[in-house]
């Protein structure tokens, strides 16, 4: 598959600058980015330091899954049931999610240099592992939507990554990364990528399940969205409790959230099929605003929109962490534990 343009990879890498520990001018590095290197005995064995992050790592481990557990060919019959516009829309969503997920995974290595705590390192190792599963799952789903024509998929990806809807997200991130005054502000941008810029896509895919379409794809979407809920909760926890140095003001964080929500809703409205009965665009935009308020509360900041919780018939409400299984699902994808910020 043709990869995203190199400037996009550079943009996401710049979200968490790596630290060159070989630098002779260590005093020139920002103090907030210099990890602790004390040569004490605890450097050479594991000792719990971050119980909250340790809990999220353990939750992620309990709920490991792989793409090989699912038979995506069961969904092939449903491809022909989509209109041409609907098929284009879902191809577009999975192209975006696949590219963004891969780039987030590339960026995790750079995050490790910001922290000395082994609990945080171990958590990020676990996140890298499951993000790789997401990447492989997205690739399988993409091929299904292109009738297993890998050349057609590659050509489409090459073109769609330059679409205005995706470029608006990348351009905004580029601009904001350049303007960032601290690593903490860049960390907020990472929270927005996984917490806001994925949310409309997850919801739009979930609408397929209430129409008994793409059952296996929806099961995978279920698991990926729950994994990302853990990742975002961990990012909020690390930002609040373990990221040293100056942090952006509440006003600045709210400004970034407002802009991200506007871009995500515009992304959906631009790409969504106009005459489809499958999804409710305005309900999804309401969910995006609700997600923003929820994340701000997770960061101990006041909400912006005071958006109500989605109603019970909103499809992502089926993706709770409790042991519930949709009537149409043939494999139970209930999580072993609970995610505190889930619906």
From Swiss-Prot:
Fe cation 1 binds at residues 101, 131, 134. Signal peptide: none annotated. One of its GO terms (biological process) is DNA replication. It is an enzyme of class 1 (oxidoreductase). SUPFAM superfamilies: Ferritin-like (SSF47240). One of its GO terms (molecular function) is ribonucleoside-diphosphate reductase activity, thioredoxin disulfide as acceptor. The chain crosses the membrane at residues 188-208. Its EC number is 1.17.4.1. Keywords: DNA replication, Host membrane, Iron, Membrane, Metal-binding, Oxidoreductase, Transmembrane, Transmembrane helix. Coiled coil: none annotated. The active site is at residue 138. Its cofactor is Fe cation. It is a single-pass membrane protein. The keyword Oxidoreductase applies. Ribonucleoside-diphosphate reductase holoenzyme provides the precursors necessary for viral DNA synthesis. Allows virus growth in non-dividing cells, as well as reactivation from latency in infected hosts. Catalyzes the biosynthesis of deoxyribonucleotides from the corresponding ribonucleotides. HAMAP family: HSV_RIR2 (MF_04028). Heterotetramer composed of a homodimer of the large subunit (R1) and a homodimer of the small subunit (R2). Larger multisubunit protein complex are also active, composed of (R1)n(R2)n. Belongs to the ribonucleoside diphosphate reductase small chain family. This is Ribonucleoside-diphosphate reductase small subunit. It comes from Gallid herpesvirus 2 (strain Chicken/Md5/ATCC VR-987). The lineage of its organism: Viruses, Duplodnaviria, Heunggongvirae, Peploviricota, Herviviricetes.
């Amino acid at each position: 598959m043709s990869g995203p343009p190199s400037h996009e990879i550079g943009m996401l890498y710049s979200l968490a600058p790596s630290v060159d520990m070989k630098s002779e001018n260590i005093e020139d590095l920002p103090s907030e980015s210099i990890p602790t290197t004390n040569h004490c005995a605890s450097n050479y064995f594991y000792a719990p330091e971050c119980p909250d992050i340790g809990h999220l790592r353990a939750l992620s481990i309990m709920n490991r899954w792989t793409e090989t557990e699912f038979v995506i060919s069961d969904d092939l019959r449903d491809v022909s049931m989509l209109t041409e516009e609907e098929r284009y829309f879902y191809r577009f969503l999975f192209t975006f999610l696949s590219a963004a997920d891969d780039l987030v995974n590339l960026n995790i290595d750079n995050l490790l240099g910001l922290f000395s705590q082994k609990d945080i390192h171990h958590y990020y190792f676990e996140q890298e592992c499951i993000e790789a599963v997401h990447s492989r799952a997205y690739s399988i789903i993409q091929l299904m939507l292109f009738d297993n024509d890998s050349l057609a998929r590659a050509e489409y990806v090459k073109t769609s990554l330059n679409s205005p809807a995706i470029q608006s997200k990348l351009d905004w991130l580029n601009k904001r990364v350049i303007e960032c005054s601290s690593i903490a502000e860049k960390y907020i941008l990472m929270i927005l990528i996984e917490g806001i810029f994925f949310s409309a896509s997850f919801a739009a895919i979930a609408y397929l399940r209430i129409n008994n379409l793409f059952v296996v794809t929806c099961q995978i979407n279920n698991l990926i969205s729950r994994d990302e809920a853990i990742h975002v909760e961990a990012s909020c926890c690390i930002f609040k409790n373990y990221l040293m140095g100056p942090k952006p003001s509440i006003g600045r964080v709210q400004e970034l959230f407002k802009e991200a929500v506007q871009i995500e809703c515009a992304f959906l409205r631009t790409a969504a099929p106009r005459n489809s009965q499958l999804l409710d665009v305005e309900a999804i935009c309401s969910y995006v605003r609700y997600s923003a308020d929820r994340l701000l509360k997770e960061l101990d900041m006041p909400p912006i929109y005071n958006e109500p919780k989605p109603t019970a018939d909103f499809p992502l409400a089926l993706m709770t962490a409790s042991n519930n299984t949709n009537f149409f699902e043939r494999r139970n994808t209930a999580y072993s534990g609970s995610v505190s910020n889930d619906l």
